[in-house]
Curated annotation (Swiss-Prot):
Domain of life: Eukaryota
Endpoints of the signal sequence: none
UniProt feature, compositional bias: Polar residues: 178-187
Protein name: Putative uncharacterized protein DDB_G0268364
Source lineage: Eukaryota, Amoebozoa, Evosea, Eumycetozoa, Dictyostelia
Region (Disordered): 1-46, 107-264, 370-389
Species per Swiss-Prot/TrEMBL record: Dictyostelium discoideum
Bias kind Low complexity: ranges: 10-46, 107-143, 161-173, 188-198, 241-264
Amino acid sequence: MAKIVTRGDINNSLNLNNSNSNSNSNSSININNNNNSNNSNNNNLNNKNLKKCPICNKSLTNNDPNNLNGSILHSIECFVEISIALKLEFKKSISIAELNHIGKVNNIKPSQQNSPQNNSNSNNINININNNSNNGNSTSNSSDETVEGFKKRKRKDEFNTFDNQQTSNNSSNDNDDISPTTSPQLEQHQQYQQQQHQQQHHHHHHQQQQSSPIITRQQQKQLLLSPPPPLLQIETPSSPPLQQQQQPQPQQQPQPQQQQIPQAQQLRFIDSQRLKQQQQLQLEQQLFQQQQQQEQHQQQQLQQLHQQNQIEIQRYHQRQLQQQQQIQIEQQRQLLVQQQNQHQQKQIEYQKLQQQHLLLHQQQQQQQQQPQHQQNQQNQQNQQNQQNQQLLQHQQQQNQLAIIQKRLLQQQQQQQQQQQQQQQLIQQQQQQQQANHSKLLHLYQQLPQPFIHIFNSLTTEQKQVLHTRVLSHPPSDPMSPLQFVQTQLVQFNRQMDLRKSQQSQSVNTITQPQQQQQQQQQQQQQQQQQQQQQQQQQQQQQQQQQQQQQQQQQQQQYQQQVPQQQQQQQYQQQIQQQQEELVESELAISYRAAIFPYLFGTRCLGNRCPDSFKKYHIYIKNELIFSICPIQHDNNSFSNAKRVLYSALEYAGVIDNVIKSSSVVCNGCDERVGDLIRYEKRESSSGGREIQFYCSIDCFLNTNFYKKKQTK
């Protein structure tokens, strides 16, 4: 029985034992699979965590080691390759088994060999096939000698065994007669061997005509799955028990003689078959090697394609990065161009304002240098201008008074409209109350006498609750209003069981309390309306008084104004404000364009700065200028960072100037320092501006910016 086990490292040993003894001759074929691997590998090809082939231990060529389909196919291919090799070796071994079987069928009893140790002549043939397919190739190695030497020795042993059998049969006693009969199984086997020899000869001739064909893996799988050819059915009886072997065999009856095949012819036929099988094996090995070379070539091509694809992908990513960098550079360049254009426009506007200011200053100087008669003329012109301005102001006042009167009229009209709306609302409420009153009367008059008695026994609060419930009764309710009133009265009656037995009144007393209640309600509503009208009149009077006060205040303001001097001051203030706004906008533009690229909250520009201290962030009008650390960096040398800071603060109007003085006290540390002094314009509580002095940048930052930031 041949059994193939697919495991990690396959050690297939093909043992062919040919033993001739006095008792019987046994021929057996054993194929043993020895697993020499240290790890116990499962024979499950559907293992999901399969990273190596379970047959050849070869790492899978698929990119995904967990790919189930790829691992199964690879294992089947290895299985096909190994099974083909084993199948061919099995065919080779059958010929030796047949030889022994022929001797058994013909009842050829080998004679005992004269040996000092054993009386039996046994020829043991061991073929070890070790398939350690780390590279996918199957190699056949013998433990003691090579395959070719083994084949030559095997052939010599077979000839020697048959010669010894022939001589032993001839020199045996008369009891050991040889029956030259041939079995029908041997004839069938000879016919099958002749057919196979013709097919092999035809196939070999066809292969020589054609160029060496390549057997694909699919064909190998079909060969593996196809049933084997009908071999000679060799019945090898199992070895009998010891008792049967010891019993003497009965003497066989002589059989009729048949045509006996000479042993030399049989050996030649077997040798020819063996040669043909060896040739087929060599051809199949060559085809297998060619197929492996083609597969290796395809794998190399795939690897080259994969490398080329990776190179192209890297190039594509590099191009994308270059394009993104170019886009960013262009965007930055466009922003810089826009900022430069805005800066140029604001510079032009600032220059225009400076020119206007210079012209005004020149005109004032020229006016001061003119003689007195020109000044008199100017005074006259100024007086005329003042009169004209007064007339204009008077006209403006009249226009404003007219506007105020129009507003008052509009307010009065609005108040009248509001009063009318309120009266309409009151009338609507009265109409609704009358309708509700008539509705209630109609319902209560329809009530039977017991319910009227219950109604009369209710208190005023209970009646008001009943009125509201009846009026809020939805029309979609299947219960009619009369039924609803009756149910409500029944509920009140249950609550007032004690009063129901004491009170008994007539039916006609229903309308009197209702009329009294309505009259009281109307009187209350009239009083409320009168109160509302009085309140509205008071509000109108207050509004008129406020309007009169506003007019008086406006007239006083117009009278207090000095026309010419105040206008000139206002004009100068406007010019200063415009200049400050332009300076601040220029500062923002210049610092965004120039300072931020190398000072954006990262490093201090001071000399000998370890850059490990906490930085102060400078803010001007809620806008970050840059950061600086609190170390004094060479006040005498006046480092780059301080120079940038002072220039920024001077442009922003926070610090006006830098002077040297030894008589001024620092506002931050209260010390007199004869070094660089900075002073700041700040708005005081009186409305003006005061000057504060600081001896260093640390005092300035600690007192102004850093403390403010902490308080926030």
